[in-house]
């Protein structure tokens, strides 16, 4: 405790024996031990009291924190945070009101200035030359017209070729037994009909095909009639000799 060695203790004991005497030394040592024990007890009591005080302080802190947590309200913190923003908004509103109020004053002061007489308007004569409302028409290029004429001539040539082929087939389908008078009469009649018919638009391929089929049917009927006439004549000739014999 006091950093005293054995040699120092021996020196102290010798001094005490010499000074105090051998008779009074034991009771003095007892009294010294009792005082040391009392001091130790006092120190222990002080420590216990100090520890209890620390514990109570810690408990008080804990209790205070718990009470703070219970009493904590987020709305209050939000209000505290929004207060500076509200102040800024109020300042901006006041600045805007101040900025608008001078403009109103200026407008009120400028009103009598506008009440002064206005100079009469000068009538400016309109110019004689007027521009057309629509832009001038641009002449179309001749190339598209030539292309259109070539495209129109191609279907005409194709139609003429198809008509020639259909007529050739109709002529080939006619029977050889038709008399020359009919053969001679048909071109004349066709020429007459063609001359009598008014100028009509060129027939399409479908109409030409229909006409060719009609001509084929008429030719077949005429062939059947021509074949039936010689058969009837032969039958009548054969019937006449039988009657003569009877």
Swiss-Prot record:
Keyword Acyltransferase: no
Chain positions covered by the region annotation Disordered: 94-122, 179-204, 225-246
Gene3D superfamilies: 1.20.5.3310
GO cellular component term, pick one: TAT protein transport complex
GO molecular function, one term: protein transmembrane transporter activity
Biased composition (Polar residues): 97-112, 187-197
Cellular location(s): Cell inner membrane
Annotated TM spans: 1-21
Entry's Gene Ontology BP terms: protein transport by the Tat complex
InterPro entries: TatA/B/E (IPR003369), TatB (IPR018448)
Pfam families named among the record's database cross-references: TatA_B_E (PF02416)
Keywords linked to the UniProt accession: Cell inner membrane, Cell membrane, Membrane, Protein transport, Translocation, Transmembrane, Transmembrane helix, Transport
HAMAP family linked: TatB
Function field: Part of the twin-arginine translocation (Tat) system that transports large folded proteins containing a characteristic twin-arginine motif in their signal peptide across membranes. Together with TatC, TatB is part of a receptor directly interacting with Tat signal peptides. TatB may form an oligomeric binding site that transiently accommodates folded Tat precursor proteins before their translocation.
Family: Belongs to the TatB family.
PANTHER family: SEC-INDEPENDENT PROTEIN TRANSLOCASE PROTEIN TATA, CHLOROPLASTIC
Subunit and partners: The Tat system comprises two distinct complexes: a TatABC complex, containing multiple copies of TatA, TatB and TatC subunits, and a separate TatA complex, containing only TatA subunits. Substrates initially bind to the TatABC complex, which probably triggers association of the separate TatA complex to form the active translocon.
NCBIfam families to which the protein is assigned, alphabetical: tatB
Name used for this protein in its record: Sec-independent protein translocase protein TatB
Taxonomy of the source species: Bacteria, Pseudomonadati, Pseudomonadota, Alphaproteobacteria, Hyphomicrobiales
Gene assigned in the entry: tatB
